[in-house]
Amino acid sequence: MTVAIEMGQTSAGAPAALDLEELLATRLLVQGNSGSGKSHLLRRLLEQSAPWVQQTIIDPEGDFVSLGERYGHLVIDAEDHTERGLQAAGERARIHRVSTVLNLEGLDAENQMRRAAAFLGGLFEVARDHWYPMLVVVDEAQLFAPAAAGEVSDEARKLSLGAMTNLM
């Protein structure tokens, strides 16, 4: 069964749709300048696909927490959990097929990177017999893959880069 996610209109006025099954079989990078509509496009994609596929959103700015109330995503406030607790939450989300929003708002860059890496690590370390299609969205992904350590420790950068690499 093909699930067409309506994203807008073509220049000719016809509906522009994305095949969800095709999207889940590959990777997608949404890139653009500030104000170009990246967040709007991601929200549309998430809202349209929510009934069809498990989702995990890594949300550094709290922009997607409203999906919890509207679509039933479990919102996890990373600030309230240890790295080990977030790893366990990632494992449980995968096993029980729960859509989640990992809210990283309020944490400094180091802790955002560490906690996102722990949660994603939990998702990926679960036995393969629990793997089902999942749409993973990392908003502001550049925050989790810095070219140099800068304001964060080398260890946090390494953990975060490892988690981002697992998504590829």
State what each model feature region is.
Residues M1-A16:
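N-terminal pre-Walker A segment at the start of P-loop NTPase domains
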Residues A16-L20, L29, R43-G122, G150, ...:
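Switch/coupling segment of Walker-type NTPase motor domains
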Residues L24-A25:
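Pre-Walker A (P-loop) beta-loop-beta motif of ABC nucleotide-binding domains
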Residues L29-S36, L46, R114-M168:
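Conserved P-loop NTPase motor cores
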Residues S39:
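Walker A/P-loop
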